[in-house]
UniProtKB/Swiss-Prot annotation:
<comment type="similarity">
    <text>Belongs to the archaeal adenylate kinase family.</text>
</comment>
<keyword id="KW-0547">Nucleotide-binding</keyword>
<feature type="binding site">
    <location>
        <begin position="10"/>
        <end position="18"/>
    </location>
    <ligand>
        <name>ATP</name>
    </ligand>
</feature>
<dbReference type="GO" id="GO:0005524">
    <property type="term" value="F:ATP binding"/>
</dbReference>
<keyword id="KW-0808">Transferase</keyword>
<dbReference type="Pfam" id="PF13207">
    <property type="entry name" value="AAA_17"/>
</dbReference>
<dbReference type="GO" id="GO:0005737">
    <property type="term" value="C:cytoplasm"/>
</dbReference>
<dbReference type="InterPro" id="IPR027417">
    <property type="entry name" value="P-loop_NTPase"/>
</dbReference>
<keyword id="KW-0418">Kinase</keyword>
<keyword id="KW-0067">ATP-binding</keyword>
<comment type="subunit">
    <text>Monomer.</text>
</comment>
<protein>
    <recommendedName>
        <fullName>Adenylate kinase</fullName>
        <ecNumber>2.7.4.3</ecNumber>
    </recommendedName>
</protein>
<keyword id="KW-0963">Cytoplasm</keyword>
<dbReference type="InterPro" id="IPR023477">
    <property type="entry name" value="Adenylate_kinase_AdkA"/>
</dbReference>
<dbReference type="GO" id="GO:0004017">
    <property type="term" value="F:adenylate kinase activity"/>
</dbReference>
Length: 192
């Protein structure tokens, strides 16, 4: 039997991973144990097992067809995990590149993953900008509030297209400054 597959997305700096991890910890205490999987890590595991990459940076240098195959295999592995327990997949709905927005979950991944719910974690663009500026542990491209808002709009559009292709519901969770507990509670209500 397939358990729930939930995809959690958000722009860099929105706090999606933090909100998800806190929700997972509380749900685990309640006896609901999700397996949390980062999609990029799942891809790296496949590439590493095949001897194609020994670090994540090397994956970007693989030819597009190999990358697509690795994406598909990672989606299949995550779907297999869902036979054992519910799975929360931490990934990006879209990736902003110099040539435009790249879908984080192209059709060949969605077919394998078949998510039940797609969650988009958001907040105001100026809050994200301030979080990015204060986070010295990460090297992120400097963006304007307007470009962050555009990226969030594209994430919503991509999430809805993922829903159209799979029948998944799409939920927007707001992670406002100082109100992370509200975001965690909202996320948990969907995950239960």
């Amino acid at each position: 039997m397939k358990n729930k597959v939930v995809v959690v997305t958000g722009v860099p700096g929105v706090g999606g991973t933090t909100v998800t991890q806190k929700a997972m910890d509380i749900l685990s205490e309640e006896g609901l144990n999700y397996k949390m999987v980062n999609f990029g890590s799942a891809m790296f595991d496949v590439a590493n097992e095949e001897g194609l990459a020994s670090d994540r940076d090397q994956m970007r240098r693989l030819d597009p067809e190999t990358q697509k195959r690795i994406q598909k295999m990672a989606g299949r592995k995550i779907a297999e995990m869902a036979k054992e327990s519910p799975v929360a997949v931490d990934t990006h709905s879209t990736v902003k590149t110099p040539k435009g927005y790249l879908p984080g979950l192209p059709a060949w991944v969605l077919t394998e993953l078949n998510p039940d719910i797609v969650i988009v974690v958001e907040t105001d663009g100026d809050e994200i900008l301030m979080r990015r500026l204060s986070d010295e542990s990460r090297k992120r491209d400097l963006e304007t509030t307007a470009s962050i808002e555009e990226h969030q709009f594209m994430n919503r559009a991509a999430a809805m297209s993922y829903g159209v292709l799979t029948g998944a519901t799409v939920k927007i969770v707001k992670n406002k400054n100082g109100l992370v507990d509200n975001a965690v509670e909202e996320l948990m209500s969907v995950l239960r």
